[in-house]
Amino acid sequence: KALETRYFETFLPIVTRKSRLEDIGLSVNGLPSWSGTNGVMVLFYPPPPKIKDDPTAKPDRLGRVIKKLAEHQKLDLRGKINIANSVLETLLDATDKVAVAFSGGRDSLVALHLTLQIRPNVVVLLVNTSIEFPETLAYVRQLAREWNLNFHEVKPKVNFWKLTEEQGIPVAGRGNTTFMRQLSDKAGVKLSNSCCRRMKETPARQFYRNYGIEGVVTGLRVCESLMRKMNFADYGALRYSKTYNTLVCWPLYAWTDEDITAYIELHKLPVNPLYSMGYNRVGCWACLQDMLYKDSRLFTLQQQHPHLYEAVRKKFGRQMIRLLSSWAELDKWAFDEEHLEGLYKPCSFEMLDEYRRLKRKRRKEQA
């Protein structure tokens, strides 16, 4: 009951010592828990059963979480800073072996700055996938020097271009597996989102294991996607991650874009120069996960980093055009040729010609 009350008020678990549980004779059998190397135990409110086991449990939980989440999101910046500090302090109560996952983006910058106020010497990790923007690498390394960070940079052992050739290209997140399968079959293009796992998660997990890291701070926010909101409803602001074999916390779960901007301006934090160049996201420049949308980062890449755009076009150009064409057909809307011309024509007429050829072929087949 105490776990339930705490979860639906704060989205946090209960942190206690194993010895205290033994002293009061409390059994935690059946409860999800995590034990660190310092004798501390974290008790989690159980996640809901799968839909097939109980069709009502998950929607009911989601409804309760969204209601409380709305209250937290209405708080002013000071209130949200207090929530973030509460999440961070709960993690630090559980373990002092903590790292901040820093991508060079605005969200992780705020998460890093908040953590530094509590733990100045916290470990800071950047996973350099080898397809990070050069501006991001320069920015993060300079910040590490200026802020005297306990900074570490790791790289994957796999090559992005070779991996995508073998596994497939990434064009949708993990929550879109059904859509990806349909699109892959329709376009005859191999799709996969395994690059995130192989190029980001694996080297991070190895680093955490080698350095004995037990807790990770992220800049994840629930307002960024429905999948994140549903995941948050299941596990809250501090959870155990099987992927990293660590605790993972979301101190910024209730923050909006406006909150992030306000905090950065309040503390005069230096931001990644990519934002002033028109980018909304500063992750891997070769990632195609937003290529199916008209606000695709590919447009900005084409304008600001034409040499990087050309590398993407040469490697994935024909697959991209087939995917766009097939997506239009799956969603039953006519793809705007002007959109294609704006994105591809300056670099290659052959891509637009390929699209038109496929379009003529489909018309003949339909006739």
Regions from the PLM with identified roles:
Residues 147, 173, 295-298, 333-334:
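A general structural signal for short secondary-structure boundary/capping elements
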Residues 253-308:
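Mid-to-C-terminal catalytic subdomains of enzymes
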Residues 199, 288-291, 351:
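Extracellular/secretory pathway and lumenal proteins
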Residues 195-196, 284-287, 347:
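Disulfide-bonded cysteines in secreted/extracellular proteins and peptides
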